[in-house]
Amino acid sequence: MATNSFCTSNHILVGLGGTGGKILKAFKMRMFEEFPTQEERSKQPVALLYVDSTDEMMSKDGRARADFRVMGQDASFTNNEFLNIKAVDVEHILDHIDHYPSVKGIVENVGAVKSAIGSLGQAAGQKRRAGRLLFAANAVGYVNSLRDAYSRCINVSGDSSETTIHIFAGLSGGTGSGSIVDAIIQTRKAFPNAYISVYAMMPEMNLPKSDMDQGRYYQNGYAALNELNALQAGAWKPQDVTGGGEADYYSDRVKGVANGLTIYSNVNENGLTINSFTELPKVISDYLFARIFFVNDSDQVNSDIVRAYKYENMDDFALEYDEAGNPDPVTGRIPVARTKKVNSIGIKRVMYPELRVLKHITYTIGESVLYQFKYNNWRENQGFANEERNRDYRNDFINKENLANWMLDEEHLTLEKKILPSDSDFMAFNEYWHDKAINYAQDAKKADCPLNELDNIMGDSFANFFRDCGVENYYAGKEKAIPDMAKEIRHTVEAGFFEKWKDGDISITELQKISKLLIERVSEIRTELEATTKDEIEEYKAIDEDRKANLKEWSDLGILQRMVNVGERKYVRHQEYLTEFYTSKTRLVALEFAKKLAAKVFNELGKMDADISAFGMKINEAINETERLVTAQRKVNKGLEDMKGAIIEVSEDETMSEFEQELRCDKIEMPIIARQLRDCILPEEFVNFGRLAADISIDDITDAFDIKLSEIVKARHDEKADSDKKVLGLNILTQLQQKLRTDDDIKAFATKIVSQSGVFVQLNTDQIQLHLRNNEGNLSPTNPASINKKAILVSIPSPDDNPGLKKFADKLEAAFKNSFNQSTARTTITVNRKSLRKDELSIITVQYCFPIRAIDWMGDYKKRYERFLNTGNLATDQANAILLHSEGNGSQLPSLFARSDEEIKAAEEAYRVQQAAAQQPQAAQPYAQ
């Protein structure tokens, strides 16, 4: 199914650290799913930049990573999508601080920083200051990489008027959390007119792994949020790591440095907890994917959600003023304490899982094909069975005809027939010596003793002229070629095996059996050659006696007897004896050679057998992997019975199984499919099974399934599936209509799915409703427009000109609009009935316009943070502050939480004292009017 895209502006996705990398990975793999061809992807003005202090998510040695493969394609990060900031070690930076002027500004005390950070391994090790130092040392490289990503976008869009840069980071570690502030600043510095959106993941309260917290997990999160708030409020200007002095890039136009912060966790507002390693990156990726490609910003129906994620119409409420602040005596303005350009997001997808269904069918059929590869055992109503068939392999394959074809008969082993193609064709031994005896018989008669003369002539041929060099010389010379002959025999056998396997006539398991039987037969041949040699020696001796006896009889004849028929008969008989004699004598030499050759052939066939077994193992591994893939594509959620997950599948796996069964039991189609898959997997030239096992990887086989077999499956589906049996190309509304039979079912579905969706952060109602000094009137919670707003977009596909389906969609829309609770946030809900996503109904939620202090877990973070910085040991506290904060010790930042009445009174008194002592007014900051 082709994916329609509403992406018309440039989008750059920047992933910082492991969390950012996981989101970019999920996004890129989704790109390959939705836009499966390079041509489609190349039309999207979207570029990625992954920044990390480790390359563990990158391909190694140019090899594709298995976990980045999507339908036979490699979605791994390319080199121009990755910036490794561990190229320079932190310890080296601190030891040579003068060589890093841009870094020097963020290191007040080299010794203290070096002592606090200590030694690092492959990454920043949950030390934010180390993460910032690494980024700062590579900040110019970051800007260059960002500009390169921008160029890639411009090359596609041809339009530089609108660019959005999305920055992703987790706040608990060292790399992403430590570099996020500089990444925002340098991005704004390089692209002053870009829309910059920051996505920051909070620490999980319940860790997926017990070893994730190295003592600073939550403290890092609080420190990072503190810095982000101060940066966005214009209350903190950190050092510019690509220039001198403070980085003053706060913009009153956007009310921040970035346009806004998206903060999220692994628990949504309704208490749904998802895995932060596997599910959460996909949720964020899915939200961003919908925002970039599926939400048409120019369509009025999407206006509310667009305004929500772009923080529009909230300039009057973007900032929270310091409740302990007092008017500046000159300007009368009150300092800003906090930003409210903060949101959180959520997406729930109710979908017909077409890709999963296609993969399940593909891998199920692929598994059946692999059974053919392995066993070639067809069973009616089952297809290719996962078990071998019974057969008399010795009788069927290890027979005289095949041995001759494989050059394992005596004629070939003795070289009576040639083995190497480059050798000449020679006469059979008996024919050769018979011709010699006949051809030289007349010449020999001229001698006094023609019998001896003929014997001498043939003996000379034996010694010097047989095959141009004499028998013993010939075979002695050929011994050097025994390895080549053994390999030629093996190749002949192996090539024949391969062709039969390739044609689908025989399985790899059967080849293994035949191979072992052949080795057993060659062992028997070696024994038979020994016995044949003994028999030939006896034959040779008997012929020699006959030859000698005939010579003596001829010698005993008188002159007249020799001249008449008696002598002629003796001479003719002697020719026969000499033919047999030299044939036997040649065979004896040839048999000795054959024994040596057979020994070498035995070894070669042993190697062949090992190679066939290796290839068989590769098929077994492929079967195991395919079984895993089939299992991975099985339905993992309960569909409408359990709607807690971010993705809810509505499908009929029984219909899918029926289609699979029909196809894999098709006796005509399955052998054709197996042959097509073999042609796709196999190299053009066969060398041997060992090379085949080495050259064909499991990925090659699964790629053939993803690329070739999936297309075959789709074609067969379109040919075979009746309208009510289709499992591909279905409308989600059709599936829902089959499940939601009554109006009550529809209402219950809408209510339940909405109650279990929502943004991935929980807010504290007390903090939301808190009334603060200097934020009265229109800025107070009594004005619902000032805080905690929510926009919801429900996207429903068109009903395919089906009146019944349209009526169902009408009821569904009404149910959704009546299902949202307006009591906790100012909520707008829009239903888009023109979604081009035929297989999906989605709910996108954006909750926005609240201060970070309103996030429910912040109180717990604050307690852990303060305990970490107040151990009672001043040196430890100072070192801990260096580890947590990217610059300074945090005291320069405004308070994330509202101050107490006592603190406000103390601040007012301190302010009066300060004003009395002040000689110069403070530099201007963002202030309330």
List each language-model region with its residue ranges.
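Terminal, contiguous helix-loop blocks that mediate binding/assembly
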Residues: 2-15, 19-32, 36-163, 171, ...
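Short, glycine-rich nucleotide/cofactor-binding loops
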Residues: 170-177
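Short acidic, glycine-rich surface-loop motifs adjacent to enzyme active sites
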Residues: 166
